[in-house]
Amino acid sequence: SKSNAVAVMLPGAFYTLKETQVPPIAALRSAGVDMAVATDCNPGSSPISSILTAMNMACSQFFMTPEEALKGTTICAAKALGLQGNYGIIEPGALAELAVWNATHPAELSYWVGSSILHKRISHRELS
């Protein structure tokens, strides 16, 4: 897209509030709009704190691909927060906020619901 705008998907709020109008994922995808995925964790409209659950819901409710959900919780989420370049990427000079998962394929992150497949966290370290 020509804009720097990021569409933020909040599947937890969609589910909790019993919304019926699904975000226009196909149109956003066709237009090249970056799509972030977030929990919007709060006690009123989205009591979901697991980013993996949000990824699963983005795939199952909004028909995002597992790759889009992963990109939506990393690169696009950082961009939505104005943190692109330092976060959401794995490359030299970036600030590490990494989760190491017990998974054999990245798509598994969107698959498992209610189980913790986190192996280890690496936080606030510059990657070299």
Where are these regions (language model features)?
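Active-site-adjacent C-terminal substructures of enzyme catalytic domains
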Residues: 1-86, 101, 127
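Sequence-level detector for tyrosine residue identity
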Residues: 14-15, 87, 111, 119
